[in-house]
Amino acid sequence: MSEVAEKVKKIVVEHLGVDEAKVTPEASFIDDLGADSLDTVELVMAFEEAFGVEIPEDAAEKIGTVKDAIDYIEKKKAE
């Protein structure tokens, strides 16, 4: 697992209070991990702070799974 993936997983566990085993790449923040819309906004803000990237609102709306977050952050960091 990449450094970005590990960090994303840690942030999700901390913010949503879910079991680490549930935080798989395919896990949906809302459907699988019980997040609501406010939780997803807070997660995006935490990702921005942790990785030093900006995630515009239109991109944030497309981040629905753990893998979506990892892929987006890795892409932004590579720019």
Curated annotation (Swiss-Prot):
KW Transcription (keyword) present: no
Pathway: Lipid metabolism; fatty acid biosynthesis
Subcellular localization, as worded in the UniProt entry: Cytoplasm
Keywords: Cytoplasm, Fatty acid biosynthesis, Fatty acid metabolism, Lipid biosynthesis, Lipid metabolism, Phosphopantetheine, Phosphoprotein
Gene Ontology, cellular component aspect: cytosol; membrane
Keyword presence, Lipid metabolism: yes
Domain of life: Bacteria
Record-listed O-(pantetheine 4'-phosphoryl)serine modification sites: S37
InterPro entries with a match to the protein in the record: ACP, ACP-like_sf, PKS_PP-bd, PP-bd_ACP, Ppantetheine_attach_site
Gene Ontology biological-process entries: lipid A biosynthetic process
Pfam families per record: PP-binding
Domain Carrier residue range list: 2-77
Processing and modification events after translation: 4'-phosphopantetheine is transferred from CoA to a specific serine of apo-ACP by AcpS. This modification is essential for activity because fatty acids are bound in thioester linkage to the sulfhydryl of the prosthetic group.
GO molecular function: acyl binding; acyl carrier activity; phosphopantetheine binding
Function as written in the Swiss-Prot or TrEMBL entry: Carrier of the growing fatty acid chain in fatty acid biosynthesis.
UniProt similarity note: Belongs to the acyl carrier protein (ACP) family.
The protein's name in its UniProt record: Acyl carrier protein
Organism the protein comes from: Acidiphilium cryptum (strain JF-5)
